Amino acid sequence: MAASITNTASDEAAKFPRLVPDAYSPQIAPVFAWYVTRRLIPARFHAVRIVTESLEVARSIDSISDPVILVMNHQAWWDPMIGLALAATFWPSRRGVAPMDATQLEKFPILRKIGIFGIHPDDPKSMAAMVDFVQSRFATLPRPTLMLTPQGEFADIRAPLVLRPGAAALAAKFPACRVFSIAIEYAFWLDQKPEVLIRVQPVAGPEPISTTGWHRALTMGMQENGARLAAMVMARDQAPFTTFLGGAASGTNPFYNLWNRLRGKSTELSTSHRR
């Protein structure tokens, strides 16, 4: 069995010399997802919340029989970890793949075990190889999901949205795919830890289908989704959101919280009395 897996990996490396294929492990991937979702993210963030009006959209992804492409804005190192938590929570039956800079992937080889493959973003031949690689995954995986960050690099949430052409080329290449935009923001509200705030919406394809048309559709869809989420983030109100990770009562720090409990006072921070 081990020899078979090794041979398969070698065959793929020879078939796709311009990229680093993923080496998905059905044993390692679920454990990694559990650790990220149940340990790593809750330790670093107060809560992960999704806009309630987009909850059914997120859940519907799990039942789509065709391949799905997910496009996310790219602010931070945490983006793929949040994407993994979304997948584990809302579309757990799908098998995901996602590209990453091959140079960075060399530093974190375990990520290949969860479906990450390496590309050379500035090499046109590597980008062309990615299309062929994705096509091979779409043809062999059951209900595959491709997660992309089309900006291609970290970008401030306030900066104008500029997308590289790869995502549009892939969407045009696979017209049967369903495409969704995932907007993410990291914000400090009342707790000492930040919130992760998410909104999901479908992206309608262009008519006729073309790379240029998809580039325009993705740009407009991601801008609209991001703007709607931003308005809710600035309102600093958790009411329009559904919390799916964390979300315990806000506090300042363990010592202050203990002191307040000893005095019989609530440790929760709130500004509702001012409304």
Predicted regions and their residues:
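Membrane-anchoring hydrophobic helices of lipid-metabolizing enzymes
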Residues: 1-84, 95, 108-116, 195, ...
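Short helix-capping segments at alpha-helix termini
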Residues: 89-92
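Hydrophobic/aromatic beta-strand patches that form the interior of the parallel beta-sheet core
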Residues: 99, 117, 180-182
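Short internal beta-strands
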Residues: 96-102
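Non-catalytic C-terminal accessory region of glycerolipid acyltransferases
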Residues: 2-24, 128-275
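Glycine-rich, highly charged phosphate/nucleotide-binding loops
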Residues: 48-53, 123-134
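Short, polar loop motifs at secondary-structure junctions
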Residues: 102-106, 185
